[in-house]
């Protein structure tokens, strides 16, 4: 960890008691700040508050009192998910108080090598692939952190100048990271997402590009080259641009040509040997290859990871095979694009379980994918009527309404036959029925296990 004095004697408010918020509060206290930690909920575990106060940190729980904006804080470290138009945050914005996220704090104290991944889809898989590739044969520590469920500031505090962190960075985190500068930045893709938070597509894109805002020509931006829109984004960086392309639209970085994956003019491996299924995972593999090669990773390590890595939980996760039916959990599919790419990964007939929080959009874009891949559609949640309408437009012969992703499992089994894929890929957020996509996916897996009498195979 870097020894910095920027926070000594400063008054800092930490908003949000999540994993990253609590770690940020403790780190700031160690750095000499006077810290107040606030959460609108009262923690279920009383030890959370007791531990904070035992460390000399003031805890304010049960609300976000506007009076905090009048207490002379020098800095706010905000949970990324709290919108800037929330009354308390808006009050600090109006006063001109600097507001950062824990991603920025972690960056400020990290002394080692930083690789960072963002994008609308594929972030977690790509982050994990890169971490495993760079770690293989590396004598120093290599960890992942960030939006992947591990506090960046905590890991940064523990690691030294020869170590590497691969972060997954969300648009929410990047908005509050004004000096963030990874040596290697990766943008997997950019679609319209989180418009309830960012308000406009352009705001969302601008937030994502925060990953390369401070890079120089000595740094690298690895970016998907398969859409003209994404190619244009590369003009907005000072970094050295390294493209990756499943469609071979560039051969300057990592790309697929024919049945093989290449790094520049060097063949790495056959695409069919990548264990992860679907074209989106070829793209994730290419992005990881580029970042790994720029980090000096040997081809043997890259091939070993790509031929053994079976996936990240809830991201097109293979669950089990029972009586000729294969079950997949893609609960992380919270937008239309993710379900599009999931369906493209299967040649077998798909019984699709889809639906969830209604964010106000329709699913007409899914119609051609339904038409080509979906044998039966089981819909649930707030958006079920819109999802059903898309299925009807596609000519899906069997459409069934269910309560949620759990009750849909026996319905899917009833409609299936040997050779079918039963896929949970909701194309919607989970918050209408579940606390998050992880819980939704876990409940789906439990329902599959109960139905089949088997345990998941990963």
From Swiss-Prot:
GO terms for cellular component: cytoplasm. Keywords: ATP-binding, Cell cycle, Cell division, Cell shape, Cell wall biogenesis/degradation, Cytoplasm, Ligase, Nucleotide-binding, Peptidoglycan synthesis. Its main location: cytoplasm. Gene3D superfamilies: Mur ligase, C-terminal domain, Mur-like, catalytic domain, NAD(P)-binding Rossmann-like Domain. One of its GO terms (biological process) is regulation of cell shape. It comes from the Bacteria. Pathway: Cell wall biogenesis; peptidoglycan biosynthesis. Pfam families: Mur_ligase_C, Mur_ligase_M, MurD-like_N. It catalyses: UDP-N-acetyl-alpha-D-muramoyl-L-alanine + D-glutamate + ATP = UDP-N-acetyl-alpha-D-muramoyl-L-alanyl-D-glutamate + ADP + phosphate + H(+). It is found in: Cytoplasm. SUPFAM superfamilies: MurCD N-terminal domain, MurD-like peptide ligases, catalytic domain, MurD-like peptide ligases, peptide-binding domain. One of its GO terms (molecular function) is UDP-N-acetylmuramoylalanine-D-glutamate ligase activity. ATP binds at residues 119-125. Belongs to the MurCDEF family. Cell wall formation. Catalyzes the addition of glutamate to the nucleotide precursor UDP-N-acetylmuramoyl-L-alanine (UMA). This is UDP-N-acetylmuramoylalanine--D-glutamate ligase.
């Amino acid at each position: 960890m870097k020894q910095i004095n920027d926070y000594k004697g400063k008054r800092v408010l930490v908003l949000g008691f999540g994993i990253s918020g609590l770690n940020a509060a403790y780190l700031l206290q160690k750095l000499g700040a006077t810290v107040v930690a606030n959460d609108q909920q009262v923690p279920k575990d009383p030890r959370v508050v007791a531990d904070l106060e035992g460390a000399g940190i003031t805890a304010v729980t049960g609300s976000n009192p506007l009076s905090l904006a009048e207490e002379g804080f020098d800095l706010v470290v905000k949970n990324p998910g709290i919108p800037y138009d929330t009354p308390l945050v808006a009050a600090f914005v109006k006063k001109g108080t600097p507001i950062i996220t824990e991603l920025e704090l972690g960056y400020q104290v990290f002394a080692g090598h930083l690789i960072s991944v963002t994008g609308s889809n594929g972030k977690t898989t790509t982050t994990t692939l890169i971490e495993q590739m760079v770690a293989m044969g590396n004598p120093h520590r290599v960890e992942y952190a960030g939006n992947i469920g591990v506090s960046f500031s905590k890991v940064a505090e523990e690691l030294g100048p020869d170590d590497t962190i691969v972060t997954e960075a969300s648009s929410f985190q990047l908005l509050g990271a004004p000096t963030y500068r990874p040596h290697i930045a990766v943008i997997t893709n950019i679609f319209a997402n989180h418009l309830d938070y960012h308000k406009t597509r352009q705001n969302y894109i601008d937030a994502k590009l925060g990953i390369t805002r401070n890079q120089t020509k000595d740094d690298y931006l690895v970016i998907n080259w398969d859409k003209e829109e994404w190619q244009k984004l590369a003009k907005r960086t000072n970094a050295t641009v390294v493209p990756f392309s499943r469609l071979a639209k560039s051969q300057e970085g990592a790309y697929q040509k024919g049945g093989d994956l290449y790094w520049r003019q060097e063949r790495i491996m056959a695409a069919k040997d990548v264990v992860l299924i679907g074209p989106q995972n070829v793209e994730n593999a290419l992005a990881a290859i580029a970042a790994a090669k720029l980090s000096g990773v040997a081809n043997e390590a890259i091939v070993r990871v790509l031929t053994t890595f079976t996936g990240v939980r809830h991201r097109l996760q293979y669950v089990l095979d029972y009586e000729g039916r294969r079950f997949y959990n893609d609960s992380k599919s919270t937008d239309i694009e993710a379900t599009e790419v999931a369906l493209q990964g299967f040649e077998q007939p798909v019984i699709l379980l889809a639906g969830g929080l209604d964010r106000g959009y329709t699913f007409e874009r899914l119609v051609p994918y339904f038409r080509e891949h979906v044998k039966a559609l089981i819909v649930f949640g707030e958006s079920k009527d819109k999802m059903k309408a898309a299925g009807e437009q596609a000519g899906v012969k069997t459409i069934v309404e269910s309560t949620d992703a759990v009750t849909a499992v026996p319905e899917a089994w009833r409609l299936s036959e040997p050779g079918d894929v039963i896929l949970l890929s909701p194309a919607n957020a989970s918050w209408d029925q579940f606390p998050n996509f992880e819980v939704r996916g876990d409940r789906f897996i439990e329902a599959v296990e109960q139905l089949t009498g088997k345990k998941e195979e990963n």
